[in-house]
Amino acid sequence: MKRNAFEELRVQLRTLKWLGVLRFTIDFNKCLVRENASEERSAWLYLIGVVGITCSLIVYSTYFPSHFIMGKHNTTGNCYALINIRSCSIVTMLIYTQLYIQRFRFVALLQSILRFNQISGSHREEGRFAFYYYTHLSLLIICMLNYAYGYWTAGVRLTTIPIYLLQYGFSYLFLGQVVVLFACIQQILLSILKYYNQVVLKNIKSSKESREFYYNFCKYNQVIWLSYTEINHCFGLLLLLVTGLILLITPSGPFYLVSTIFEGRFRQNWQFSLMSFTAILWSLPWIVLLVLAMGRNDVQKEANKTAKMLTKVPRTGTGLDRMIEKFLLKNLRQKPILTAYGFFALDKSTLFKLFTAIFTYMVILVQFKEMENSTKSINKF
């Protein structure tokens, strides 16, 4: 018996709906995505609530920065921590706002993928999707326990620790589910592309022009358009903001390790070992999100396979030739398919560059810390 289209994403979509985004009704049997008045009101109330809470946190951290100070950190580290939590609040608010503004575009995107997924019967990814989902939730629990212990040990006020945990916990849950949805949709598109690749290849091997080949190639063009245009419009700016936030937050763990532990603030062996482990785990959940968003570029590879096949198609002097040439020129030869709003490609090479940037950023922070220590030493004389 054929399974319902898009059934693999039920849990992810319901989680995002519970978080107040992508609030619409999905009929998995009829491949329909609808938004009604009550769902729109709920989405609006969620947005108002998130904007109000995040703005309140930003104002509170601005007027009472001393409440967020870590007693065992230096001035550079405390300034960096304030920048991080404010940036996290701003990015969360911006992404919530964008998802609300673009909700109709997401409706169209999901409905199109629903239809293609039902046609191709691509239902082989539920195990991988469940792995993505539960890995993210497991990392959320680890992240919160680690943050709670880390802030308590660092000397943060007990009344401020829940604020840190609420902001980072909610942001990691929300942003992580958006990244998981993007990764899952990317895998679904990959399965659909593989299906149409096989169909088009079978048509090519038949060595004859047919309506079936023209029809399948048109469908393939639509899938590429979804991958190249609609996915980038829906997720491009979101991933750009998420990447920037991760790039900002990730050095916090290693920087805390350098600025506290290696300066002898935790002298006992068990304290040193435990805080080293805490610092290592501090940035791990965010790095996993970065890898999940950019660790695979199989959609681009599958599209390139199609390009190689289409170059072997004999030219007939018909409109199909122009269609193939336009496809090769526009969609494959000029730029990558998946990008963060055109700023950079979402692939492994970009992932490596981002890790290099994170390391460079951490070195700069350490240099600021050393300058601060040198200034303090000079002032003593």
Curated annotation (Swiss-Prot):
Its main location: membrane. The keyword Glycoprotein applies. The keyword Transmembrane helix applies. It is found in: Cell membrane. Pfam families: 7tm_7 (PF08395). GO terms for cellular component: axon; dendrite; membrane; neuronal cell body; plasma membrane. Residues 65-78, 150-172, 256-273, 372-381 are extracellular. Gustatory receptor which mediates acceptance or avoidance behavior, depending on its substrates. Plays a role in sustaining courtship behavior in males, possibly through the reception of a stimulating arrestant pheromone. This is Gustatory and pheromone receptor 39a, isoform D. It comes from Drosophila melanogaster.
